Amino acid sequence: MNESFDKDFSNHTPMMQQYLKLKAQHPEILLFYRMGDFYELFYDDAKRASQLLDISLTKRGASAGEPIPMAGIPHHAVENYLAKLVNQGESVAICEQIGDPATSKGPVERKVVRIVTPGTISDEALLQERQDNLLAAIWQDGKGYGYATLDISSGRFRLSEPADRETMAAELQRTNPAELLYAEDFAEMALIEGRRGLRRRPLWEFEIDTARQQLNLQFGTRDLVGFGVENASRGLCAAGCLLQYVKDTQRTSLPHIRSITMERQQDSIIMDAATRRNLEITQNLAGGVENTLAAVLDCTVTPMGSRMLKRWLHMPVRNTDILRERQQTIGALQDTVSELQPVLRQVGDLERILARLALRTARPRDLARMRHAFQQLPELHAQLETVDSAPVQALRKKMGDFAELRDLLERAIIDAPPVLVRDGGVIAPGYHEELDEWRALADGATDYLDRLEIRERERTGLDTLKVGYNAVHGYYIQISRGQSHLAPINYVRRQTLKNAERYIIPELKEYEDKVLTSKGKALALEKQLYDELFDLLLPHLADLQQSANALAELDVLVNLAERAWTLNYTCPTFTDKPGIRITEGRHPVVEQVLNEPFIANPLNLSPQRRMLIITGPNMGGKSTYMRQTALIALLAYIGSYVPAQNVEIGPIDRIFTRVGAADDLASGRSTFMVEMTETANILHNATENSLVLMDEIGRGTSTYDGLSLAWACAENLANKIKALTLFATHYFELTQLPEKMEGVANVHLDALEHGDTIAFMHSVQDGAASKSYGLAVAALAGVPKEVIKRARQKLRELESISPNAAATQVDGTQMSLLAAPEETSPAVEALENLDPDSLTPRQALEWIYRLKSLV
């Protein structure tokens, strides 16, 4: 049976009717239905969960005459199972028992208390601590796209308005959302297909008026002018849908989402999806994190610092004032790194703890960690106080002190609290008098009974008097049958035994009532006091979030100071003049994985030297040289020091890379098609301030086609766009370009050949390479000797046929010789013999018809 199609629940048992009504409200997601100590799943949900979680599929009786497929998971292990489902892009509705089974007639009342989705999780167990977890929404109209992202674990809310498909693809690549909401009529499905966590949403959720209303309500504002997003209608449509979805799933207020920020293209260096992939910023080409720029650069000591550093790497800033401030801070912090990092490490992930506090899902250990973070602040303040730097002092001020909150948590929460508040033992002794009394009652029953027994023996003089307890009759005073006639008048008989009588007195009855309820009362009061702690902490949420942000930024900057010192990086200089000048530049990742010294290389790009044609053997280091230039520029524009002896860098608006390619089988695109699509994007969008890396353009097609395309692309970049370009090629004909165009120069990476062996020099020299060393590289790769021998023989034959092949002059007139000669069109021949001045109007008209027939 499929519950989504069965709307008549009357044939089912009352409990299954309740389940099916709840399930009908959440037809597309799994429903965890609480029954005692288990969460149960039924019907299709059970079948799906058994496959996804590898749990047993069983049957539960019958309802409506059919056996019910069922699967269950224990409630104490729910977080582990949720983590597995979320990682597979699934969403889960958590349905809890909210009624009292003792007073319920029929099934106990239940309701869905939260919905766990990949993009809205805040639980520590479900999140990757050093990676942002974003929920995103995308909207499209005739003018472009609207895109909004929210990190619910920090409250960071952003929107943008990508103008075209390429920019939108780059945004998706940069943000990599865990969950993506899109309208039911979204046209560009090819753009988002294959992404995880896709959620189709109704059109009305994207309405602009609803969006404005929702956002103003959330921020407590009358309009959105103060956020700079008032006129970003496409972005607001996406943001409105996103906020509605979060409210639907969280079912609680969201006080930590206090503002929204517009991300504008002109504020950061733009990198398309291919560039981010090729530069291996946070993910390598195989999809892992090893040997990436982040892997080398990220030695941050807090998870929130690590996440901020990765955001910086993916959004390099163009504002040189911000960059110079970061550089100054890094320089100022270099002497205090070893003192600061151990203290910062103790701060932990304050950012995400605050999000759970705002959502009121923070656990006792979260509050203990928050207290521990507050306890580090005095020492951090003391260490930073002596640093002579205005930006550092500004950060110190934003960190705050929170002495009152620290004192509150030190008084309220025990040193090592349990995982859940329902387990009790969270609130510290001495914090609340009534709680201490209830606990004393629950814990101190034995002491009280001993004291009562001694007192009553002395008062009555009865040496056989004992005080005891049993599960049926509760507390009692027992006197032997021989002395029972001496029992005081206030003793009320409770039970008669063979050799004794048992009594109760009002004081003991009152104590019994207290003890039996004390544990429950203590737990209930403890839960109430715990909730009150939230009420005391939440008014400080804005200041706490500012502090967490400042601590994360401090962690990033201290980390960059440590990396600069450890890896021998230098501070780059920003200039208004276009160009990049690097002395002894190094590749930040390759130099770390090499077992031998890295050969540093210079680079000089300027308006007079805009393009470098790079030649040299395969494996000679062309790609490394190009990528290191882009990575040095990228590091400079996040404010970091860079791997070089000296760097002077001018304005950069975009970084493009056309480096390597593979078949895009999913989209049915060949290597060459992928290559040309990326090239077209560069030629359409590059400017004179762009840094362009072009590696082996045209190699995916025939020699002459490839050479023609490479020549034309180089010409366009050098003459028309005038971008700062590194153009690596295996077409030696392109080394003629500097003779034909201004601003183009040849450089090469050399190698030495000795017999069948080859030594790569990895150093960049001016001028063109003398040969390609292709056969030597093939031999090095292990190609059989007889194949290499035959290749040498064939090479000599080809060179004897065309001895000047390598030096063939290729200019505009000779380019046409590369294509097969074409027959002249009959229409062209007819036109060549025509004198237009001698034609009458009638003859001209006849000629038009004649030419039409010839075409």
UniProtKB/Swiss-Prot annotation:
<comment type="function">
    <text>This protein is involved in the repair of mismatches in DNA. It is possible that it carries out the mismatch recognition step. This protein has a weak ATPase activity.</text>
</comment>
<dbReference type="GO" id="GO:0005524">
    <property type="term" value="F:ATP binding"/>
</dbReference>
<keyword id="KW-0067">ATP-binding</keyword>
<keyword id="KW-0238">DNA-binding</keyword>
<dbReference type="GO" id="GO:0140664">
    <property type="term" value="F:ATP-dependent DNA damage sensor activity"/>
</dbReference>
<dbReference type="InterPro" id="IPR016151">
    <property type="entry name" value="DNA_mismatch_repair_MutS_N"/>
</dbReference>
<dbReference type="Pfam" id="PF00488">
    <property type="entry name" value="MutS_V"/>
</dbReference>
<dbReference type="InterPro" id="IPR036187">
    <property type="entry name" value="DNA_mismatch_repair_MutS_sf"/>
</dbReference>
<dbReference type="InterPro" id="IPR007861">
    <property type="entry name" value="DNA_mismatch_repair_MutS_clamp"/>
</dbReference>
<feature type="binding site">
    <location>
        <begin position="616"/>
        <end position="623"/>
    </location>
    <ligand>
        <name>ATP</name>
    </ligand>
</feature>
<dbReference type="InterPro" id="IPR017261">
    <property type="entry name" value="DNA_mismatch_repair_MutS/MSH"/>
</dbReference>
<dbReference type="InterPro" id="IPR036678">
    <property type="entry name" value="MutS_con_dom_sf"/>
</dbReference>
<dbReference type="GO" id="GO:0003684">
    <property type="term" value="F:damaged DNA binding"/>
</dbReference>
<keyword id="KW-0227">DNA damage</keyword>
<protein>
    <recommendedName>
        <fullName>DNA mismatch repair protein MutS</fullName>
    </recommendedName>
</protein>
<comment type="similarity">
    <text>Belongs to the DNA mismatch repair MutS family.</text>
</comment>
<dbReference type="InterPro" id="IPR045076">
    <property type="entry name" value="MutS"/>
</dbReference>
<dbReference type="Pfam" id="PF01624">
    <property type="entry name" value="MutS_I"/>
</dbReference>
<keyword id="KW-0547">Nucleotide-binding</keyword>
<dbReference type="Pfam" id="PF05190">
    <property type="entry name" value="MutS_IV"/>
</dbReference>
<dbReference type="InterPro" id="IPR000432">
    <property type="entry name" value="DNA_mismatch_repair_MutS_C"/>
</dbReference>
<dbReference type="InterPro" id="IPR007860">
    <property type="entry name" value="DNA_mmatch_repair_MutS_con_dom"/>
</dbReference>
<dbReference type="GO" id="GO:0006298">
    <property type="term" value="P:mismatch repair"/>
</dbReference>
<dbReference type="Pfam" id="PF05192">
    <property type="entry name" value="MutS_III"/>
</dbReference>
<dbReference type="GO" id="GO:0030983">
    <property type="term" value="F:mismatched DNA binding"/>
</dbReference>
<dbReference type="InterPro" id="IPR005748">
    <property type="entry name" value="DNA_mismatch_repair_MutS"/>
</dbReference>
<dbReference type="InterPro" id="IPR007696">
    <property type="entry name" value="DNA_mismatch_repair_MutS_core"/>
</dbReference>
<dbReference type="InterPro" id="IPR027417">
    <property type="entry name" value="P-loop_NTPase"/>
</dbReference>
<dbReference type="Pfam" id="PF05188">
    <property type="entry name" value="MutS_II"/>
</dbReference>
<dbReference type="InterPro" id="IPR007695">
    <property type="entry name" value="DNA_mismatch_repair_MutS-lik_N"/>
</dbReference>
<keyword id="KW-0234">DNA repair</keyword>
<dbReference type="GO" id="GO:0005829">
    <property type="term" value="C:cytosol"/>
</dbReference>
